């Protein structure tokens, strides 16, 4: 679990997301509260439950990006799901309990990777020894003592191996054969039995070994992973992962507005209301069975988001509304925001296109007036057609640099200056013609 302060979390989010300070503050406080709760002693810790967040705002303003960046900062089991992918129990489709099962999978994967890193050095030493045993077989009939000459040769080869001088040489090694992935389709509600069957069948032939001819660099990676797997305790990993998912897990539910229905609608919307009712016990606290064991959801943080164009947060069932006490509204983006997205973010579109074309020795030089004009056109197109927020910049940039991208090999060694005139020449007519901008931009 991350111990970053709210200020540090917001500062990190600022590198990738422009504006939306209230949403950033809300998720930063929620994340910090997870750490604060862990510091509370005694029975009171169990009584402190997370305050779930509902983010409301139009498309393309940063809701999903906040979730993506939060996942990297959290250092905790994190999963992002689309509310529209789930159906009410009894209908064909995924049920909401699969959210927690997926979170458990993520927690186990994260814990295993963490444990593997701890034993990496020992695993690499063991892998080196196995490769050296193939390169320099021990003398037959040896009484266990290594002759001085062989020891010197072994150390010389170990040095070459570590310096990468042997990476391209071929070697034959015995490795554990990877288990084939077995997919078993089971009826809804029988997921636990399906997992047990899959686990049982996957045990067959799991210890088979076969000889493979590989480059030493590939063999080193394969053997290191194999040796690391021997050094970690799988049962301990599962136990710690379940506890981590229960205490620190974060679930981000996108498109929650798509399962909110207006009162006058009917028909297929019955299933949508059913999804809300099925989500309710998860959010307020229940126990879900996974292949690793039972997970209690009482302390899992839920963050939901939606544009709410055709519905309102009040169209969610009242019980679910009450489970998301913190509501933050994200604002539509202005021209200045578009400019900041293009110039100030850590991996802005400008930097991405410059890096892509630099691979063909083409230098893209964006002048401030050109970027301002580009931001204005993106904003105007959003105003006149559908407002898709910052995603409009990707469309406009692709159109702007279409010619340069196509002729990059011919322009090798040249500098292309993107100024106001260049932007107008390629985009002004399209942006002024509403029909063209609707279909092209």
Swiss-Prot record:
SUPFAM superfamilies per record: P-loop containing nucleoside triphosphate hydrolases
Single Gene Ontology MF annotation: ATP binding
Any one Pfam family match given in the protein's UniProt record, by short name: AAA
Keywords from the named record: ATP-binding, Chaperone, Cytoplasm, Nucleotide-binding, Stress response
Gene Ontology CC terms: HslUV protease complex
Residues at which ATP binds: 18, 60-65, 254, 319, 391
Cross-referenced Gene3D superfamilies: 1.10.8.60, DNA helicase RuvA subunit, C-terminal domain, P-loop containing nucleotide triphosphate hydrolases
GO biological process per UniProt: protein unfolding; proteolysis involved in protein catabolic process
Subcellular compartments: Cytoplasm
Top-level taxon: Bacteria
Family: Belongs to the ClpX chaperone family. HslU subfamily.
Function per UniProt: ATPase subunit of a proteasome-like degradation complex; this subunit has chaperone activity. The binding of ATP and its subsequent hydrolysis by HslU are essential for unfolding of protein substrates subsequently hydrolyzed by HslV. HslU recognizes the N-terminal part of its protein substrates and unfolds these before they are guided to HslV for hydrolysis.
Subunit structure and binding partners: A double ring-shaped homohexamer of HslV is capped on each side by a ring-shaped HslU homohexamer. The assembly of the HslU/HslV complex is dependent on binding of ATP.
Protein name as annotated: ATP-dependent protease ATPase subunit HslU
